[in-house]
Amino acid sequence: GVDEFSTNAPLVQAVHAFGAGWSEPQLTAAGQLVGSASFQQDAHLANTHTPSAAAHDRWGYRLDEVEYDPSYHRILGAAVAHGAHSSAWAEPRSGAHVARAAMFQLFAQIEPGHACPVSMTYAAVPSLQLSDRLAGEWLPKIFSRSYGSALADETGKSSALIGMAMTEKQGGSDVRAGTTTGVHMGGTSYHVTGHKW
């Protein structure tokens, strides 16, 4: 295998130049992991065996689930275990955002498909912090370094990642074509009209 961190001189220099030199041991360990033959194989498998929709079970009942190859879950689990999704917020200190960005790059450059939920989770934290209720409910799960691939609602999970639903059938990837609306119903309730894919 290859140490994807230590052999990347510009990344090593940037980590030190911008105050995150303290993170070099963690970044080196992650660099060795993502450069290993087994991680590279998982990246290959995750992109060869793409997600598939499971709309209905064998009796015809709606599922609306997405099935992923186990390799994808191993990659996502490793990124979460290394804090690529929230370490800068969970353990704030000088250079923490630089260290997290470097960690994110190490994982995303090998398998970019998992980068979306990892980066969205990182980006969602400041918005969640604006609400004491939401922060109290979600941040402990987001700051967790564990990853559970089982489909369950938030009450049955000790960790969480954040995603977004922007695509609508009439718009495809054109977000401007969205027609879904939300009307505040009081308290923490909204009435949503439309649907997302």
What label would you give each PLM region?
Residues 68-197:
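Glycine-rich flavin
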